[in-house]
Amino acid sequence: MDVAPPNILQILSRAIKERRCIALRYQGQRSVRVVEPHAIYSDAESQLMLDAYQIRGHSSSGRPLPFWRPFRVKKIDEVEILKNVFMPRSAEGFSADRLKYKHGLVAIVEAPGAVFAQPEAAALDVGPPRPAHMRRAV
């Protein structure tokens, strides 16, 4: 199975459980994307994937926002949970019953709560800390 930094996987799982938007940096890009995370799962090549509905930020494809987008979890460099809460995008095509979610599911959002699973390794916050500019002041 693909390996992702445990703290990033833990943050993504929490955002899905709480149905909160996230800001992320992807593949070393400087720009930030804001997405509504809906599911984390292993694909056919055992890569951890995040299915998310991108609502703001950079799009290397040039597609107009908003749109569905899969992200390879291991290519997510930074992630921060935002205050914005979202409802699952059923009208835009999201379904927890999709075949790709049947095997290797880590976390998935459902209304009004979330069906939530977390691998044992992700429960440990052993990865590198988030960069200072992405931490919230207490």
Spell out what each predicted region is.
Residues 1-138:
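Core beta-strand-centered patch of the WYL/Sm-like small regulatory domain
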